[in-house]
Regions:
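Beta-rich strand-turn-strand
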Residues: 119-120, 130-143, 149-152
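Flexible, glycine/small-residue-enriched loop-and-beta-strand segment within the central core
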Residues: 4-5, 27-37, 42-133, 164, ...
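Short arginine-rich
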Residues: 153-158, 188
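Flexible glycine-rich beta->alpha loop in the catalytic core of nucleotide-sugar glycosyltransferases
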Residues: 88, 95-96, 138, 149-150, ...
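Extended, small-residue-rich solenoid/repeat segments and analogous flexible loops
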Residues: 1-36, 40, 187-189, 193-195
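Short-chain dehydrogenase/reductase
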Residues: 22, 83, 126, 132, ...
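Conserved beta-strand-loop-alpha-helix hinge in the C-terminal portion
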Residues: 157-159, 165-181
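Crotonase-superfamily enoyl-CoA hydratase/isomerase domain that binds
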Residues: 182-186
Length: 195
């Protein structure tokens, strides 16, 4: 994977970024001044990051796999240790499909009924391949979303959700919280700030 160097990341004009940020040069980045990236973040080939007014914020230790899309005018925020499997789509904007308005971005705003709402992913959230997350959703800490799920409602902490629409099907173990503590203790002396 061909990734941006630190100098190239600076030249992109990101709002800020931390250490060990690996973004594929094959990713598409729109409105980089509205994108903030923490430490230890990897964004793979063919991802689309289209930051609207709310921006996109990545915490630390985050992976965004190939072909993911983060799109919309609302904020999209990732907590530490969260990640997306391939082909996940997160939308913070949505057209009105009722027929009352015209749809698509080529139409002037006064003829559309686009709505915008923030999407928030807590710490340790993982979303399976091909899942779709709609505007206004909050995935609390530790949530797992199964592959090909459609998430239109908030998901409670450490729940495992699957389906279209996504429903809670189980409880996730919390052992990873202790592992997080151990990792943070190990990396404290060398942890750096944002660029």
């Amino acid at each position: 994977m061909s990734i941006y160097s630190t100098e190239e990341l600076r030249a992109l004009g990101l709002a800020d970024f931390g250490e060990d940020v690996r973004i594929s040069k094959k990713a598409s980045i729109y409105n980089p001044s509205r994108i903030s990236i923490g430490n230890h973040v990897r964004i793979d080939d063919f991802c689309v990051l289209s930051a609207g007014e709310g921006g996109i914020e990545f915490g630390d230790y985050i992976h965004i796999a190939v072909y993911c899309s983060l799109i919309g005018a609302g904020k999209i925020k990732f907590g530490d240790f969260s990640g997306l499997s391939s082909r996940v789509s997160i939308y913070s904007s949505n057209d009105d499909y009722s027929g009352v308005h015209l749809t698509n971005p080529t139409i002037p705003d006064q003829f559309t009924g686009v709505t915008h709402a923030d999407v928030l992913l807590g710490k340790h959230v993982i979303i399976g391949a091909g899942a779709v997350v709609l505007p206004g959703v909050c995935l609390e800490d530790g949530v797992v979303i199964g592959s090909l799920s459609l998430v239109s409602k908030n998901c409670a902490a450490f729940g495992i959700y699957s389906g279209a629409p996504a429903r809670r099907i189980g409880e996730r173990k919390r052992d990873l919280l202790e592992l997080e503590k151990q990792l943070r203790q190990q990396s404290m002396p060398s942890s750096g700030g944002k660029q």
